[in-house]
């Protein structure tokens, strides 16, 4: 006979449904070498996890994330969106190898979600919510803010971890010599 004993926390976790981006990427995101970084980011940032899950729920969308040596126009990342007559979307995200991917991934995923939401980038220019870069690509305030938000979430966790590590690894206080 085999008996199984679960801790209460583990039992609760087993009862909760596993959602996309918890332990694996949604089927419509192909990330190859970037998969571990994307999953780690989704596990530690609520905002990025929501982006990832939203992309995963968009059936007409396919996303490819790849590393590259250089990005056109001196950028660190870019997303090229392809729209198909039947309504499908394909997003090709390129990240410069060795860059800090935290802010870049969230920023580029937000560009994808802008297109899912039907944002017309040319219309956004007049309101200041979008602009053209030197290379002619569009940039948006929404994507910029998404990247900054995820960066803040990760930095806050890192700061907490650093404080805990300092306390855990701090040298014990020296005992004071007794006075006679």
Regions found by a protein language model. Name each.
Residues 103-116:
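Active-site recognition of the HExxH zinc-binding catalytic motif
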Residues 2-14:
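Bacterial N-terminal signal peptides
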Residues 93-94, 107:
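Short amphipathic alpha-helices and their capping/turn segments at secondary-structure boundaries
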Residues 16-88, 94-99, 144, 149-157:
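Auxiliary, metal-adjacent structural segments of Zn-dependent hydrolase domains
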Residues 10, 19, 28, 174-177:
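Intrinsically disordered, low-complexity segments enriched in proline/serine/threonine
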Residues 11, 74, 169-171:
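Intrinsically disordered and other compositionally biased segments
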Residues 144-180:
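Long, well-structured alpha-helical subdomains associated
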Residues 99, 115-147:
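Post-HEXXH active-site segment of zinc metalloproteases
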